[in-house]
Design a protein with these regions (language model features):
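Extracellular receptor-binding modules and their adjoining Ser/Thr/Gly/Asp/Asn-rich linkers
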Residues: 1-37, 103-115
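Extracellular attachment/recognition segments
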Residues: 28-96, 101
Length: 115
């Protein structure tokens, strides 16, 4: 997933030598359950230090868990692992299978990082 800034005038916000970036994106067209949905920030040399919270699609049907898959040192690679999500009855999650296309969904998330 490539994150695009919500409002270029407002983001990224500098906090010390790091930046807070709020953006939106669409999950990948062909999800890979093993590697997840690799996350990057568009238009900047931006390395992600942390992703704040879970990622939920705007229609509430999918929930994503951000994971540092390339280690925890500087410039770690982050991926989102997607699950179907239901609030009816007993809330439940089920892993999205490989090859599933959820690219029509949209989500918003916040990352901290910098160049």
């Amino acid at each position: 997933m490539i994150l695009t800034t919500l409002t270029p005038v407002k983001y990224p916000i500098h906090t010390g030598n790091r930046q807070v970036f709020v953006g939106y994106g669409n999950p990948t067209a062909s999800y890979n359950q093993t590697t997840g949905d690799i996350l990057s920030v568009a238009f900047t040399p931006f390395f992600i230090d942390a992703v704040l919270g879970l990622v939920v699609t705007t229609d509430g049907t999918y929930i994503g868990v951000p994971v540092p898959v390339g280690g925890v040192a500087g410039a770690a690679t982050w991926a989102i692992f997607w699950y179907t999500f239901a609030l009816t009855g007993t809330p439940s999650w089920a892993a999205v299978g490989s090859g599933v296309n959820i690219s029509a969904k949209q989500c918003q998330l916040t990352v901290i990082g910098g160049a």
